[in-house]
């Protein structure tokens, strides 16, 4: 009877720990810690809003710099 009581107490302790933590106290299958294992799901790479487009990033390189317009003087073009 004492053995079954100890087993029930250990089972209750284990279930309460897993309910509080949300997961069993083990490492994820990739072998990293709990925080490093979940990091790939939390962080997403930055992407542009419009997508790559036809220029594929070369637009800045070939764009002609426009002169600044001032309030005084003639128009530059």
UniProtKB/Swiss-Prot annotation:
Record's signal peptide: 1-22
Major subcellular site: secreted
Single biological process term from Gene Ontology: positive regulation of vascular endothelial cell proliferation
Prosegment residue ranges: 23-41
Bias-annotated ranges (Basic residues): 58-71
Organs and tissues of expression: Expressed in the lung, testis, ovary, uterus and mammary gland. Expressed in neurons in the thalamic paraventricular and hypothalamic supraoptic nuclei. The lung, testis and uterus mainly contain a large form that looks like apelin-36, whereas the mammary gland seems to contain 2 forms of apelin, a large form close to apelin-36 and a small form close to apelin-13 (at protein level).
MF terms (GO), sorted A to Z: apelin receptor binding; hormone activity; identical protein binding
InterPro entries noted in UniProt: Apelin (IPR026155)
Keyword Transcription regulation applies: no
Protein name: Apelin
Biological source species: Rattus norvegicus (Rat)
Upper lineage: Eukaryota, Metazoa, Chordata, Craniata, Vertebrata
């Amino acid at each position: 009877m004492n053995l079954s009581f100890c087993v029930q107490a250990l089972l209750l302790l284990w279930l309460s720990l897993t309910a509080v933590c949300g997961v069993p106290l083990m490492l994820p299958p990739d072998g990293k810690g709990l925080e490093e294992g979940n990091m790939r799901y939390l962080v997403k790479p930055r992407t542009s809003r419009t997508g790559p487009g036809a220029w594929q990033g070369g637009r800045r390189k070939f764009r002609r710099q426009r002169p600044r317009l001032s309030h005084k003087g003639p128009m530059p073009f």
